[in-house]
Curated annotation (Swiss-Prot):
Gene3D superfamilies: 2.40.50.110. Disulfide bonds join C30-C107. GO terms for molecular function: toxin activity. Residues 1-21 form the signal peptide. This is Heat-labile enterotoxin B chain.
């Protein structure tokens, strides 16, 4: 009888976790963070600048519209789990720029200047 109760409890807990699930779009993902907003870009990156100069280590991208965004290069202010993700975002933006892939939407933290990219959605 105790095994049945444990099984039912485990099943209920597991299904509640599965119901939450992963975000299905950049909009859902962005809504999980504070101080963020979605920018609809639908354009290629016009310029890509990478700086490794001291305290200004970052990647800056600009679009035809003049919109400018950044990705910080991982530093001492980031925990180890953030560093790989930031490096991947930087690499993704470099490849996106070089292949002239269109960026559909960006989720950005709007409490930094320029706005710092949290997530990216691309299209072919």
């Amino acid at each position: 009888m105790n095994k049945v109760k444990c099984y039912v409890l485990f099943t209920a807990l597991l299904s509640s976790l599965c119901a939450y699930g992963a975000p299905q779009s950049i909009t859902e993902l962005c809504s999980e963070y504070r101080n963020t907003q979605i920018y609809t870009i639908n354009d290629k990156i016009l310029s890509y600048t990478e700086s490794m100069a001291g305290k200004r280590e970052m990647v800056i991208i600009t679009f035809k519209s003049g919109a400018t965004f950044q990705v910080e290069v991982p530093g001492s202010q980031h925990i180890d789990s953030q560093k790989k993700a930031i490096e991947r975002m930087k690499d993704t933006l470099r490849i996106t720029y070089l292949t002239e892939t269109k960026i559909d939407k960006l989720c950005v933290w709007n409490n930094k200047t320029p706005n710092s990219i949290a997530a990216i959605s691309m299209e072919n």
